[in-house]
Design a protein with these regions (language model features):
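Active-site catalytic loop in hydrolytic enzyme cores
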Residues: 65-67, 93-169, 174-185, 189, ...
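CN hydrolase (nitrilase-like) catalytic-core segments centered on the catalytic cysteine
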Residues: 65-87, 154-237, 347-370, 437-522
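Active-site mouth loops of central-metabolism enzymes
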Residues: 16-20, 148-151, 300-307, 430-433
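Cys-nucleophile CN-hydrolase/nitrilase-fold catalytic domain and related Cys-dependent amidase chemistry
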Residues: 16, 20-21, 25-109, 115, ...
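C-terminal beta-strand edge segments of enzyme domains
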Residues: 137-138, 197, 203-291, 420, ...
């Protein structure tokens, strides 16, 4: 792999509605400042040629311009004059007469080398823009492989995921962020889960009824913010970008973000929405007053100071609190968050008894519980989550993605699929341990119709909770019950995330992590909220996807351009 090191800049400014000359001058001013600070790659915000809040589709089309229009000519001239790569958001008038919310990228010769049309449109975009029809293109440049997306595309995992799966090392996000959560939560989450740099340039200011708070930032493949422009300010932020290294290619547990994927389990992601199990469920009537249940993450498990009896006692206390669905932490009966081969064998031998003991609790109180454990099968040991109810074992969810620690004792590699269990308290799914780190896991469970997903975990890094957990719930509009071990490298912090997330983008503000062994974190879950998949009118997080463009996510192996990068870790 070739190591490349350069400086890049994001621009935070404002576009005047319908004032092309001012918008060109403003773009030129900020590009000049970015170049003065040494930037070789500069990113401008969304719809920078025209402004954004149009009167109508006809008004939008009068301000839109083709790829050889005045704004693109100005961008090409800037790129050529300064010898830089320059990306910007463009209100485009296509050859088909439709308006598109597009992104363009010019190389140092002034040639247009990247062109993308926004796929996931918010409500206002749907009034004047057509859905993008160019797929998820990635372009090779002297700086590295670059992909483009536009603002709201980052609110679903697939667009950035498809770019990264094609080997993108850098993603440019031309944005009009309306709320800070888009910048401060979702951009770092997408960077972290994909192991890519993301350069997000947004606006600051007021355009008619829109307030743009700002929040332009440059995020490393680890999810670390390397540069950010203050809210309500105009200017540039510059950071050093390094590509061609293994930075961000591995999870904190040492597993590879790409080599550990299991594409054979993701087929549902590329299927038409109407052909998924979720589609008919969204038309089923629910009585809100009865379609509700109290659920809880129970932060209790065996460790150096507690036995399984202590953990089961805490589960009983949670039932007395009114919980009807209990999620226990990863490897509940093991005394270590990372069991050795000997530990795993002992837990597997103990599993039948643990199932019986938890079944007694479920039968006595009419509740449901998820027991994350290890079982012995014909191919050896394997991590499995057992769903137990009043009648006994309802079903099992084998772990789909093995962590490095699991591979030390797990049996022969097996191909497992995700399953969802239909119960009287809702449709339940499980993303066990390493599974929860991969956005495909919760997406497939959502498409299978899960209302509630349990994530038994032993988090290795705070950002697995701070960035990934909330996006896993909100991306799919489902309840996510995170039951984390108190002895994990990132201890405790178990909690339940509702389908619509929290009021503040910072999860630690909404739910400060509790590290105490035995903590019970309950939530009153309303299934109607989990069946409502729109984040705003007409913007369905599942139905509005473009599955026909996601084929790369179900390919095994990945394209060779990506394997070169992913297998280096």
């Amino acid at each position: 792999m070739t190591l490349r090191r350069f400086r890049a800049a994001v621009v935070q400014t404002h576009a005047e509605l319908g004032d092309l000359a001012t918008n060109i001058a403003r773009s030129r001013q900020h590009v000049l400042e970015a170049v003065r600070q040494g930037a070789q790659l500069v990113v401008l915000p969304e719809c920078m040629n025209s402004g954004y809040l149009f009167d109508s589709k006809a008004h939008c089309l009068t301000l839109a311009e083709p790829l050889d229009g005045a704004y693109c000519q100005a961008l090409a001239q800037m790129a050529r004059e300064h010898g830089i790569h320059l990306g910007a958001g463009l209100t485009e008038r296509g050859d088909d007469g439709q308006a598109y919310n597009s992104a363009v990228l010019f190389d140092p010769s002034g040639a247009l080398i990247g062109h993308y049309r926004k796929q996931f449109l918010p409500a206002q975009d749907q009034r004047w823009f057509s859905v993008g029809d160019l797929g998820n293109p990635v372009v090779d440049t002297a700086l590295g492989r670059i992909g483009l997306l536009v603002c709201f595309d980052g609110r679903i995992p697939e667009v950035a995921r498809c770019l990264a799966a094609q080997g993108a090392e850098i993603i440019l996000d031309m944005a009009n962020f309306f709320v800070m959560g888009q910048a401060d939560l979702f951009v770092p989450a997408r960077a972290m889960e994909n192991g890519v740099w993301i350069l997000a340039a947004t606006k600051a200011g007021v355009e008619r009824s829109i307030y743009y708070p700002g929040g332009s930032l440059i995020v490393a493949p680890t999810g670390e913010v390397r540069a950010r422009i203050a809210n309500d300010a105009h200017g540039v932020a510059v950071a050093e970008i390094v590509v061609g290294t293994e930075q961000g290619s591995a999870w904190a547990n040492g597993g590879c973000k790409w080599a550990d994927r299991r594409p054979q389990a993701y087929g549902l992601m590329a299927r038409r929405f109407d052909d998924t199990p979720l589609a008919p469920l969204l038309n089923h009537a629910l009585a809100p007053g009865t379609a509700c249940v109290k659920i809880a993450a129970v932060q209790a498990h065996a460790d150096s100071q507690h036995g399984t009896a202590d953990g089961l006692a805490m589960a009983r206390h949670a039932v007395l609190l009114g919980a009807r669905l209990l999620a226990m932490p990863l490897h509940f009966g093991a005394a270590s968050a990372a069991p050795t081969a000997a530990d795993a064998a002992r837990l597997a031998a103990r599993t039948p008894a643990l199932i019986d003991e938890l079944h007694q609790l479920c039968a006595e109180h009419g509740v449901f519980a998820v027991l994350p454990t290890i079982e012995a099968g014909t191919s050896g040991l394997w991590p499995v989550a057992v769903l137990i109810g009043r009648q006994g074992v309802i079903g099992r969810q084998p772990q789909v993605h093995l962590a490095p620690q699991d591979k030390a004792w797990a049996g022969a590699e097996q191909a497992h699929d995700f399953v969802v269990f239909d119960t009287p308290i809702g449709r339940l799914g499980i993303a066990m341990g390493h599974d929860g780190l991969f956005p495909e896991s919760t997406r497939v469970l959502a498409l299978l119709g899960a209302d509630i997903v349990m994530w038994p975990s032993a988090w290795q890094h705070p950002d697995e909770r701070r960035l990934l957990a909330v996006s896993r719930a909100v991306d799919n509009r489902l309840y996510l019950v995170c039951a984390n071990r108190a002895d994990a490298p990132c201890p405790g912090g178990s909690f339940v995330i509702p389908p619509n997330g929290f009021p503040h983008w910072d999860v630690d503000v909404n739910a400060p992590p509790t590290t105490r062994w035995g903590a019970v974190m309950p939530m009153f879950a309303e299934l109607a909220l989990a069946r409502q998949k729109c984040m705003e009118p007409g913007v369905d997080l599942l139905r509005n996807r473009l599955p026909h463009t996601y084929g790369v996510l179900t390919q095994s192996p990945l394209p060779s351009s990506h394997l070169t990068r992913s297998t280096a870790s």
